[in-house]
Amino acid sequence: MGIIYCEKDRTFTLQTKETTYQMQVDQYGFLLHLYYGKKAEGCMDYLLTYYDRGFSGNPYDAGTDRTYSMDSLPQELSCYGNGDFRSASLMLENGDGSMSCDMRYKNYTIRDGKYSLPGLPAVYADNDEAQTLEIVLEDPATGVEAMLLYGVLPELDIITRSVYIRNQSSEKIYVNKVMSAELDFLYGDYYLLTFYGRHAMERNLQRVPVAHGSQMIGSVRGTSSHQYNPMMILAEKDTTEDHGGCYAMSFVYSGNFQGEVLKDQYNQTRMLLGVQEECFRYPLEAGETFYAPEVILSYTDQGMNRLSQNLHSCIRHHICRGKYRTEVRPVLVNSWEAAYFDFTGETLYNLAKEARSLGIDMLVLDDGWFGKRDDDNSGLGDWYVNEKKLGETLGGLVKRVNDLGVKFGIWIEPEMISEDSDLYREHPDWALTIPGRKPVRSRNQLVLDFSRKEVVDGIFGQISAVLDNANIEYVKWDMNRSLMDVFSVMTKEQGRVMYDYVLGLYDFLDRMVNRYPDLLIEGCSGGGGRFDAGMLYYTPQIWCSDNSDAIDRLRIQYGTSFGYPVSAMGAHVSAVPNHQTGRITPLHTRGVVAMSGTFGYELDLLKLTEEEKDEVRSQIGEFRKYAPLIQNGRYYRLTDPFKSEVCAWEIVGNSQEEVLLNVVMEEIHGNMTVNYVQLRGLDESALYKEQTTGRIYSGAALMHGGMPLPAEFGEYRAYQYHFVRE
């Protein structure tokens, strides 16, 4: 299907619908990377050149041949200590203390279906949708093996990579660095696209030329972080949204990560993505195996929009799982900005009644329903219902709300513990703290040691008792601080704790998914601080940002869209003046922006005017009409909100049968000029009727002539145009 081994050339070729990836086992057993790009045929080893380079070491096997050096050859798994002085994929500390490895080809296996990773999220596929290539490399001196895993999904133009490290030696070793994916390019004038940010302003696009030296992103916070998203794009110099070559790497992992792009002395480029090497030293006893997380790769020569669509399809259909993989999500209202910690069962019931009258599907009770939790200084870890505060049982409240025809959800933060809590008084050792040091607090809370099974078991027992005794249909899983004081009392090997913590998190989430298959879980870490493909394996949507300001959200959701589908972006209409920025935007505009996400409300419904309530009912009706298209259609960025006074995007049906064009005017001026937006992805030969005016346009006209936008008075106006093919 998609993987071919040629014995004559000793090449492995991975073919997708539009791309080719090729590597070769050379005469010394090194696995060299030959090519990744637009589909091509034949052996590509002619691209390799060999010259005598000063100060470049030569493998002993090469004898007197000074033209052969790992320092200039493209590789699939570069190793520290074998003559390659660039940043390496693999760094091992051997039993004798030496820091070197020299991986040579041993064998391979090709099989139908997609590999999985024990304890880790990974792309999944049916046997007829994917193939797996396993290549085993071995260090002849130690017997340590590296198994390289390649998953090929031909129809999606997706290739996945991962690696196992198996200690087949007789001594304990340490994995000090392991990158899950490496791409080496022999030439090219590239730009690096990364997505930086901060709390409440995540995933801002940065595009910089790849210069000599290393450019690095990463996180040491224990999460993928608000500061850098674990995704990188390498683009040819002139690549645009619609034209040009570009490569993506997206990490299917939610903890510390490291992404690096470097240009070497010979103008070659290396791209690496994997677990953060800082504070990482993973022990492997004889016979043990370390499993590295997965990286999703994609390439296209058709610009950034197509690259994003490849990733969107992969995440929607081969990362997200369960009932809500394809099902439209409920429209919900979250109690946080309506009540914060100040509520009773009766106030929540009244909010649910108002929600029902407006057509909202679900009420979500946010922070404050458990333990002694009237502010953010106490109660975390005590996951029992505060019935005194509610004035009734949670099960009773949920039943009353359900009787209105409204579903019910709750907020949880299972990874955290307050020092003022029953759990901390009983199990202070469950918190991540360093003996002899006072802990670093953040939001007045500490982090539980999820690297320990008994801690995960204890918290899961509490949470499941709540879920078992009330009809909870949604959970918002929050995580409101970074990891510090990382020390586990259960091991002397502290270099493994950060990684094992994430495995504990995944174990907890996997138990929830299996025990409650119809439960919708929304991920959150102070908004978008853990927005990655790893979390999406368990939570099909993630709260995009704690910043719900509609204009800031244009930029946040724009950056997020490069790697993640609209169906994954938690987005709500919130009150004005906005609680994060103080900005006032029209209710209609807030609705249009939130519809390019999971859509819901984050405000006090009881304070809305009758006119606003009518607008909310209208928004919900429009969303229900567009929801299948929004959730499953092809997303196109039409403008850059950082550079244009207009932010425009569209979603096109997979059969080009309909399109929803969305526009927000970011700036207004006196004597306004008219802006035009050119649509993308339509059938040029087809006719499309705009559903509000009834006017008919050709697909070619909309794509090449464009659509004139109103030049109206008023700040931050928004427009939606729904076109249906005749």
Positions of the model-derived regions?
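Polysaccharide-binding surfaces and accessory modules of carbohydrate-active proteins
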Residues: 5, 9-14, 21, 31-262, ...
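Conserved, mostly hydrophobic/aromatic
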Residues: 18, 163, 287, 333, ...
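Short Pro-Gly-centered flexible turn/kink motifs
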Residues: 98-105, 282-301, 717-723
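Carbohydrate-binding surface patches
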Residues: 241, 640-683
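Aromatic-lined carbohydrate-binding/catalytic grooves of carbohydrate-active enzymes
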Residues: 324-461, 474
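Active-site neighborhood of glycoside hydrolase catalytic domains
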Residues: 391-393, 426-427, 431-586, 598, ...
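Catalytic cores of secreted or luminal carbohydrate-active enzymes
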Residues: 588-637
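C-terminal beta-strand-rich structural cap/linker in extracellular carbohydrate-active enzymes
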Residues: 699-726
